[in-house]
Structure formats: structure tokens, C-alpha cells
Amino acid sequence: MAAKDVKFGNEARVKMLRGVNVLADAVKVTLGPKGRNVVLDKSFGAPSITKDGVSVAREIELEDKFENMGAQMVKEVASKANDVAGDGTTTATLLAQAIVNEGLKAVAAGMNPMDLKRGIDKAVINAVSELKQLSVPCLDSKAITQVGTISANADETVGTLISEAMEKVGNDGVITVEEGTGLEDELEVVKGMQFDRGYLSPYFINKPETGIVELENPYILMVDKKISNIRELLPILEAVAKSSKPLLIISEDLEGEALATLVVKSMRGIVKVAAVKAPGFGDRRKAMLQDISILTAGTLISEELAMDLEKSTLEDLGQSKRVVITKDTTTIIDGSGSKKDIKNRISQIKQQIQESTSDYDKEKLNERLAKLSGGVAVLKVGAATEVEMKEKKARVEDALHATRAAVEEGVVPGGGVALVRVAQKISKILGQNEDQNVGIRVALRAMEAPLRQIVSNSGEEPSVVTNNVKDGIGNYGYNAATDEYGDMIKFGILDPTKVTRSALQYAGSVAGLMITTECMVTDLPKEEKSDLSVPPQGGMGGMGGMM
């Protein structure tokens, strides 16, 4: 086992603090509308330029192992805030730095670290409940645009694009961000339920010019098994032929005689039919077939439920306005399922997402949720160079997360104002002793840090602006982009409550742990021994006798 280097007390805390400050100072320059860029060196290719706090934090590794521990703990704050709310990483880092700096000063002055931590925790709990009181719902597209714009570093086109996407696919819809091919940002929306399964035979194609199958007002048969015998399908095919509507068959597989007969019937015009495989595998396939049956108001024919395909009737079939099938995808548009049933199914899937522990399962459940909710939107980011493209894509993803967070928990006035107002409201709370009171004051002072940093990055005097904001009430704050004071909500400067809340909670949690640190242990660096057995380099080895 390698030898360890151990540091105690103040010596350990000073080293840790140095690491915290290096990381936080690099991250905080990106905060606010006039935040600066950070250039990150890459081992290959051009350096990347970013204004995204978490991207900067992830790049930082320090040579001194004790300092690096401090930096890594703050990095954890940024990553946690990013995972939960998708944004607020810079705010979280800044809050953690402010609490740690003030807290360690108090420890050095002889305060009890445990009581300081209790005071900080008490202030954070009270601040979070006040934030919830201050929060207002974010429901209209104007507010969504504003939140997206602020999070994308005042890029209005991004805010508008996200708002449009949410309007088209609903707040639960899936919105993905991709690198575009042009200079302009684009929005592409796939309406209805789409899954990755194409037609089983090209002979089903009825639109040869585009190579797709299009069915208007079709019946939809969903079967949870492999079909190879045409006899099982004959009764339902006859019933559909009489109704003169097209039919889509979704099954585990369709092969042999059954597929050949369907192709012949389709080509002769006896019945307009198309067949596709069911999406997914195993239990997920059953669940997705169930989703389709709810969306189209049909019944899933399943042998597990002792249902017989031969005995199925038109009542068992689902219906939709239109179905479009390509080589690789099937899209069911405007299914005739009842809104109430679909809503219940969505609630059920949301519950499963909350209970799921696997990221992969969560991702798949979210996909199902989106397909039921009304579609998928793809934001294609345009830029002139690859460096700009990567930077912009990261900003758009941040803005998208922030907007989702805003819809979920509402918004508070932005620009650091919400935390200042919350700190004013809880300024009278007291702990059980004087050391806890100091902890509370440390947290309250730290809540001013985001506003001070936004002002500092815009080139103004932080103390003057902070005092002016404190003298105001409600949403009154400072707009760093235009250098004016006023109502932050009217300025359109909004922060999602979830982002501000999680930044404060994680910063308070990790900062409390750092203040109560008394000992740090790390591996001693290995000394590289010089190898004395290597002969002096005086020429080519083995050729001494030729001289």
C-alpha cells in the first residue's frame, strides 16, 4: 500500500480553500449577460471557447492533491446542480465558494464548525421555503421564451426556438438538440407517435414517388405474437374489406404465408393493408403496444390474456386519422384514443420514471412519455465554425433544461435578485447559540454573491448596486445587460425556481462538509528513481570494437 500524506486542521483547510478558489474563480467569470469567455485547451484540434460553467469546472484538475480535493468537491456542486436542474452551475459554484470562504474565516476565529454548519443548514432550509413562496408559475410562451433567452446567455433566437418547440410538442414532449448543417437555427417537429420500425415488404408502398406507405383513417390491429398462419387473420381481413378502410397490422413479426397473402391482397386492391413489426423488445415491447392501443382506442390482442386473434372483431381495432410508414419508421398521427385514458397512461409512466433507478430505463420511459404527449421536436443548431457550433449547442441544451425546470416549479426574478430578497426576508431568524447565528449570517451574506458577481462582470461597482437593490422591494433589481434598474419580471429576466433552489441546496450541503473538515489524506507522490544500470550514451551500442 502506498504511503500517505496527511494534513490536519488549519493547514488542511487552507490548502482545500485554495483549490476551491481556483476552480470557482475560473467558473464565475462566465456569470451574467456580460460574463466573459473561457478558452479550454484540447489535446487535439482547436481550443474550445465556452461560457458554460460546468464545462469549465469539468476541465480543471490541480497539481497539488490537497488543493485538487477542494476543487473536486466544488466541481461536485456544479455537477449535481447540472444533473438535477440542467443549469445554475455557475451560481451553485459561486454560492459554495462564498459560504466556504466566510465559514472558514469563522472557524479560524474560533467558532465551533458543527454549530456553523447547523446555522448554514437552517438558513438554507428557510431560504428554500421562501423561494417557493416567491415563485410564480411559468405557463405562457412569452415567459418560456424569456427563461430560455436568459439561460442561453441573452440569445433571443434560442429562447424563441425553445418556446416554439414546447408549444408544438407540449411541455412533456421530447425536444432534442442536434448540430445543424447551415448557419441558421432550425426547428423540426415530428407529430404523432413515431417508432423505429418500417414496412415489412416494399410491396406495401402506395406512394412510389416518395417510397412510403400512407393510410388514411386506417384500422390498426395490435398483436403481441408472431403471425405466420393467414387463417388467423382471415376473419378480421374480411370485416375490414367490407368497411372499405385500410388496415395496419402491428405484430411481433409477420412472415411466410401470412405476409405473402397480405402482399397479394394489397396489390390486387382487395384490401388496402400494411404490416410493421412492433417496436422494442421483451417487456418494453408489450408496454409500447399497450401505449399504441391506448392512443388509438384499440385492444392489444395478447395470448397472455387468453385472447384469440381469429375471434377478434372490428371493435378490437384501433383507429387514427393517418399513418405514414417509411423504410425505417412508422408514424401514427392523431389516434382516436380518449384524452382521459391517455392522461392516465401518462401519469402512470411519470410514476414509473420517479420510481426507476436506471438511467437507461428512465430515458426509454421519457421517450414513451413524449410519444404519448404529442411528438418529438429537434432543434438544429446552426453556426459558422465548429468551435462556435459546440459552444452554442451546449448553451442551447442548458437553456432547454432551464425552461423545463421553469415549467416544472415556476420562476423567480432573475439577476441574483431572488436570493437577495429571500435573504432579507429571513434575516431575523436565530440559531440556538451565537456560533449558529454566525453560520446563518455566513449563508445570508453568501446569497448576495451571484448579484455581486453579475455586476462585477459587467464592469460596475458591486457594493453600490447591491445596496440599491436591497433598498428596493419585490422584483426590483439591476439589469446588467442594459445597465438600468427596474422590475426584473417586466425586463423578462427570470430564473427557474428549481435552478436557484438546487444551486443553493447543493452549495450549502457541500460547503457545510468542507467547513467541518479537520483532516485530509492523499497518496504521497512516487519518487522516480534514476536507473544507474544504463551505460553512458557515447555512441551506438555494440560497436565499440570497430573503433
From Swiss-Prot:
ATP binds at residues 30-33, 51, 87-91, 415, 479-481, 495. Keywords: ATP-binding, Chaperone, Cytoplasm, Isomerase, Nucleotide-binding. One of its GO terms (molecular function) is unfolded protein binding. It is an enzyme of class 5 (isomerase). Residues 526-547 are annotated as: Disordered. It catalyses: ATP + H2O + a folded polypeptide = ADP + phosphate + an unfolded polypeptide. Its EC number is 5.6.1.7. InterPro entries: Chaperonin_Cpn60_CS, Cpn60/GroEL, Cpn60/GroEL/TCP-1, GroEL-like_apical_dom_sf, GROEL-like_equatorial_sf, TCP-1-like_intermed_sf. Residues 538-547 have a biased composition (Gly residues). Its main location: cytoplasm. One of its GO terms (biological process) is protein refolding. It is found in: Cytoplasm. It comes from the Bacteria. Forms a cylinder of 14 subunits composed of two heptameric rings stacked back-to-back. Interacts with the co-chaperonin GroES. Together with its co-chaperonin GroES, plays an essential role in assisting protein folding. The GroEL-GroES system forms a nano-cage that allows encapsulation of the non-native substrate proteins and provides a physical environment optimized to promote and accelerate protein folding. Belongs to the chaperonin (HSP60) family. This is Chaperonin GroEL.
